[in-house]
Amino acid sequence: MSKAKIGLGGGKNGATNDWNTTKYIWTKLAPHMPKDKVIWCPFYNKTAPMCEKYLTELGFNVIHKDEDFWENNHGDCVIDNPPYKISGIIKLKEKIMIRLMELEKPFMLLFPASTIQTAFFKRLYERGGFQLICPSEKYDYERFEGEKTRCMWYSVWICWNMNLPKDFIVI
């Protein structure tokens, strides 16, 4: 795997990836998140490391460190909004999901909804364990705390081995 660090904050590689999940989004997802597990949020963003703050406020035990995703493994599951592109890493979304599956780490990852229409997702889906949480609205993200943006795409939570009560949930 490329040594390119998924740490996100600023610079050439992070400039277009500094879009953070709002507290509103985390609040909508919270009823479907495990309260009894340690949640690893591995995709650190130095410009606004808000996921730990928001999830802690919602009562979750969270690990969110400025570390290389490819070289670390924390917690019981991963729930996060990963970067979609990083210069020098092709097929990033696929590589993230494969790494977590190889670690046998259950996950909930927020991706553009079009991700479920890709050939790589169809291949991974055949392995089993996938569930989807579909927002009933288009999410907006924030660059910094409180600074909302208009998103051009719809999003979906792609879940694997999270043992949700249903395979398709609309929130």
Model-assigned labels for residue ranges:
Residues 1-171:
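Class I S-adenosyl-L-methionine-dependent methyltransferase catalytic core
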